[in-house]
């Protein structure tokens, strides 16, 4: 931004990204204009919470005179709208930081990504990215903000903008701390100057704000702390509305947990399980790092998102935790190191995992919905929360070769139906169920009726190998070359003789060169000519791909190519070798078989050579007819 003139009224330019953001909001949120009021009320409530907290902890802050409240005034004839709070107010620096710049890094990029994917920027997203104030430009062309900070020595200030690239700030005579926002509604949005419309919106979005909201002299909201009331008194409708209020989610929660603990530490909580993963989790790496339920101390909000209440893998849980065992002037650092917080976190984590277990047993469909949305996040706890590791393992669900698509099996269920002579739990990882089922490495297991877990979630390759064993049975990838396939069912077709197989495998090795670790006879294949497997100490294919995606500098692991001596293609290659071992089609076919195996496991980086050789082989086949 740049200061253009040094007069009583200072004019500033928005940064380029701020202009783009305003354009996105105004032109992409037109289907939900009413959310401007929800955002203005939310900002006013935050200002009041900060003022209340500061009054208790900072003697230098001015004390708010009169009632801590939000007041809305309307004029239907002139389409005038104003909302005022007696909160903490803003200094000039805070006006510039809060209203003149993008509130959070990455916000513009996130919204542009949604726009490119033709996803609607609904009101559900606005409050989550610190841009709620700017939604006011959907309903007006010009906004005035009058404010005075509660900080000692502060002056009254007026901020104005039309959202077109600049804004102004000037000093005014304002006696009391707080903020007033006023504007004239556009003709197409004059409905928001009608009392019935405003009352409906407040009831819909802001009924549970901690402070009274007045329309002129009428209070519109019912202030109630649901977590302080017994669960038996709560109605599902008010629980749903409270969830929508604190989470900015338009959907109802999937389920909720009411907690009341008395003992070494005492606290009450109400926690919510969303139906869907918030959109930002898909677009922002590390988004859960600073998430968490709201923390209240003696009914006063201390932190809007307290990351210390839950481990990171559970921070998608929304809700409120209220305790009297912390002091009101608790700092961020004290919260982090407080033994009270550690105990609350420990108890909450145990209760939430117990909640998930109960859902899995009593409401499996609801659990399936939860697991589909948040399973990948919960799995991360296996590598970070060793105290609850056993509980997390029992929550794991997988598709398998014996389940339908979208159906799950637990490790306990898998182990219970293992054959008596099966010593290990087998899994196979890849990009998706269809690709996994098409992999030749499954043929032996399917032929023997051995169940294999299908791991298509990218995080699986990091967390599942760390389990090592379950119920004294090792978890083993089917790619590993040390699996015993001695009892494989032999193909009805007679395999080529060893004296022919040995020289053919030598030609395979010479043709593929350093790109392969070895070429060996396969005992696992039933109906495919070749397959690729990892060496005993090598990473499996999915792990290699994940490391590449993370741009980790890892040496490319060489695979072992297994050859099925009973397959017609291998038998035909043997015949061609006997006739003329210098026949170029032998090498072409070998390359094609190798790259075909790479293609099946998703590891073929370029298809150019593959297609070229395919055309060459088709040409040779058609010439021989």
Swiss-Prot record:
Organism: Chlorobium luteolum (strain DSM 273 / BCRC 81028 / 2530) (Pelodictyon luteolum)
SMART domains from the UniProt entry: HATPase_c (SM00387)
InterPro entries registered for this protein in UniProt: HATPase_C_sf, HSP90_C, Hsp90_fam, Hsp90_N, Ribosomal_Su5_D2-typ_SF
Region (A): 1-332
Cellular compartment(s): Cytoplasm
Xref: Gene3D superfamilies: 3.30.230.80, 3.40.50.11260, Heat shock protein 90, C-terminal domain (1.20.120.790), Histidine kinase-like ATPase, C-terminal domain (3.30.565.10)
Single GO term (MF): ATP hydrolysis activity
Family per similarity comment: Belongs to the heat shock protein 90 family.
Protein name, per record: Chaperone protein HtpG
